[in-house]
């Protein structure tokens, strides 16, 4: 598979940077140390051998192979210049650095010096990520400080432009709180006005006032019951009064009936013989009297029932 068919995205570059840091670490603890100590005959782990072995033992189809080989070739060739650049911003000798920190600083210094298309903030951020994966807990302080000083030296125009942009942003941020404070005061004033105004709601309130609501409903029900009883008593009293008044009307009816009987008796006497008239009149009078007796009996029973109903309603 050719190198042009491999990935070249930001993720692929990040993976290439990680593999390069691991390869540089391996080279620093073997051939680079032997070279410093003068044991040249022990050198048997050249950078290109490390790269070939890494490609053979790892899935590199998601790695930017070109960038990986570039760092594995150029950083060992520029090791003396890069170490001198790093040493300018260190507070200790470079040979006292941890090997992992040394490898991360080599990658960062190389990118700051040779890869100007990569923003210096990206270089610092990627160095921090490498330290999070492979470095010590507090090593990020040293790495960040050294690379930041190197960026000021190697990327002066970029750092100045970024600092000016940050200054403008901070000035805008400093001017905003005044308007925000005014808005907050306005909002608080509006909220206080809203709180002062009672807001009607159709939803039932769930609070301690439920007890008073229940008491009011019970009192209303009792009032309705008493009103109903009073109306019933008035109805029964009116009915009794009507029935009590009726005897006068019954008496008038009886008188009218007697008059009618007398008139009919006179008519019968004029039209029929005396004996027949007397018998017919007697029969008619008897029938009318029986009818009146039955009506009076019905009246008595009705009045007694109404009196009983009145007494029960009063109880």
Curated annotation (Swiss-Prot):
InterPro entries: NusB-like_sf, NusB_fam, NusB_RsmB_TIM44
Gene3D superfamilies: NusB-like
Keyword Transcription regulation attached: yes
A single GO BP: transcription antitermination
Keywords: RNA-binding, Transcription, Transcription antitermination, Transcription regulation
GO molecular function: RNA binding
Pfam families from the UniProt entry: NusB
Superkingdom assignment: Bacteria
Biased segments, Basic and acidic residues type: 302-315
Gene Ontology CC entries for this record: cytosol
Keyword Cytoplasm attached: no
Classification via PANTHER family: ANTITERMINATION NUSB DOMAIN-CONTAINING PROTEIN, N UTILIZATION SUBSTANCE PROTEIN B-RELATED
Family: Belongs to the NusB family.
Name of the molecule in the record: Transcription antitermination protein NusB
Organism name: Psychrobacter cryohalolentis (strain ATCC BAA-1226 / DSM 17306 / VKM B-2378 / K5)
Gene that this sequence comes from: nusB
């Amino acid at each position: 598979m050719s190198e042009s068919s491999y990935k070249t995205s930001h993720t692929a570059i990040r993976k290439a940077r990680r593999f390069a840091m691991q390869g540089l670490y391996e080279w620093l603890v073997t051939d680079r140390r032997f070279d410093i100590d003068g044991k040249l005959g022990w050198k048997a782990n050249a950078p290109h051998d490390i790269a070939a072995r890494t490609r053979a033992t790892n899935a590199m189809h998601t790695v930017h192979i070109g960038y990986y080989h570039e760092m594995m070739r150029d950083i060992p060739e520029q090791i003396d210049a890069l170490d001198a650049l790093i040493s300018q911003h260190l507070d200790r000798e470079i040979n006292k650095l941890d090997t992992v920190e040394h490898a991360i600083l080599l990658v960062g210094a190389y990118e700051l010096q040779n890869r100007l298309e990569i923003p210096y903030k990206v270089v610092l951020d990627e160095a921090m990520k490498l330290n999070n994966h492979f470095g010590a807990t507090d090593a990020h302080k040293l790495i960040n400080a050294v690379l930041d000083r190197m960026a000021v030296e190697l990327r002066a125009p970029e750092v100045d432009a970024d600092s000016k942009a940050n200054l403008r942003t901070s000035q805008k941020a400093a001017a905003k709180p005044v308007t925000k404070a005014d808005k907050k005061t306005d909002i608080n004033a509006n909220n206080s006005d809203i709180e002062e105004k009672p807001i009607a709601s159709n939803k039932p309130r769930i609070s301690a006032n439920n007890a008073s609501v229940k008491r009011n409903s019970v009192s209303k029900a009792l009032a309705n019951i008493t009103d109903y009883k009073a109306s019933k008593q008035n109805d029964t009293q009116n009915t009794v009064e009507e029935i009590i008044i009726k005897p006068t009307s019954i008496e008038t009816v009886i008188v009218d009936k007697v008059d009618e009987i007398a008139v009919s008796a006179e008519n019968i006497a004029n039209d029929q013989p005396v004996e027949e008239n007397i018998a017919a009149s007697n029969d008619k009078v008897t029938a009318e009297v029986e009818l009146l007796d039955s009506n009076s009996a019905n009246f008595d029973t009705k009045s007694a029932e109404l009196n009983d109903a009145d007494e029960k309603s009063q109880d």
